[in-house]
């Protein structure tokens, strides 16, 4: 029997600050099966969790005011990132919410038997940053999203038993190539349905052939 899995996108981001520990803890409490998140790298090489390359959309100063200067997470150290509040953009009740380390989220997941799904943005990481990320994932039950077959191969070469989520272009040839190195039980192929909330999607939508 097929089982529906509930995924918390950036944690429970409709009620809590996205990609923060409160949102991830809520995922556990509310019974989600998977936490989807977005790793990022600070200037000093720490793997944190943040969707945008700039901190400005979700970061606030301690008094709640916006950060006016454009600041890229890769241009500041982890200690510098901790000076900002990542909860106040949503509500005062989430004040003093700091940017989380990926290692802290992996620990939460391990303690609560919930899976972590890594976004495909890691495909743009440098070789050094990707290796740091892979080292963190050693021994975890994390899953990785890949938008290219080449990157999926790289993931499986490193983690032969890892579950791969493929959200790249889907056609018969792509599925054939994936099946050559990813076991059927370890592969999820994402096919978006066309609706208002998926207008931004750049891969082909589901149709009579897919």
Locate predicted features.
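Phosphate-group recognition and catalysis centered on beta-loop-alpha active-site segments
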Residues: 1-210
